[in-house]
Amino acid sequence: MFAKRSMRLALVLVAVLALAVTITAVDDVGASSAGVRKGQSVRYLDVGASVSVGVQPTPLVPRGQPTNEGYANLLVKLARATGVTLHLAKIGCPGESTLTLITGHDPCYRTVDNQLSDAVAYLQIHHSSDVLVTIDLGFNDVVRCLRNVTVNAVCVRRQMGRLQRRLPTILKSLTLATGPNATLIGVGHYNPFLAAAVTGAKNTKFAHANEAVIAQLNSVLKTAYAKYSIPMADVAGSFRTNATTLIKSSTFGLIPTNVATICASTWMCTPPPYGPNLLPTTRATD
């Protein structure tokens, strides 16, 4: 059960990331996008939050823990099958926001250290190497605004503004540290809250209300990445976020395609103790 669910989620992300790598290799998007070629040995730096480190519910930790079943691990396997060796360094932290990425003070970086400084140090050490970097941020900055089946519009505006201010700091630091043979890829976000549509009329209203929030989040991220010539993987598209055609679910009857995709690909429609579970985690700081 666990392997099936985690594999299903991770494979979707892997497919999108692989496409993005192919695009950078063919189109040479930006000075920092060298692409990867068959036979290469590439350093792979995985920056981000819960999904970046493969957080999944397990029998011992039903609410989730880091695993080796995330998209980064499967991207390594996918690359190996095409003749590219990725040496993976996962430095992400469950619940990481853009603030804690910069300042630390999270469950993973409790001293003066932080994920951003570790990422910069890694890139500087491997400045002359072929390097792939995936950046998976933003969700934990806004998830606090989507609580108790309510969209807090004031909170959304505040957090989007903070995200727009912090992202340039992060992306500038990363791009300045990269060498000429580095490929950076941003990771967009799916909408786990669509799953609320299977739990009653009030929750269905919430599911629709937060669609604009996730769309705005992806827009903010894409704009920020574009300023640094970093392509963004369209995760929302791969999760068929805008597909509303009704299909039959063996569990929930007729439901929209986008809701069915979330239920099949995440733990959001799973009963306790393993769900509902956002993955990424809802824990965040400011």
Question: What kind of feature is each model-predicted range?
Answer:
Residues 90-98, 238-241:
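Acidic helix-start/capping segments at beta-turn-to-alpha-helix junctions
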Residues 64, 68, 210, 277-285:
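Aromatic-acidic/polar surface patches that form glycan- and anion
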Residues 28, 53, 97, 193, ...:
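Flexible, glycine-rich phosphate/dinucleotide-binding loops
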Residues 2-30:
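Secretory targeting and sorting signals
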Residues 32-95, 133:
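Serine-esterase "nucleophile elbow" of acetyl-processing enzymes
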Residues 110-275, 282:
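Alpha-helical cap/lid subdomain in secreted, periplasmic
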Residues 55-69, 97-110, 154-158:
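Acidic/histidine-rich helix-loop elements
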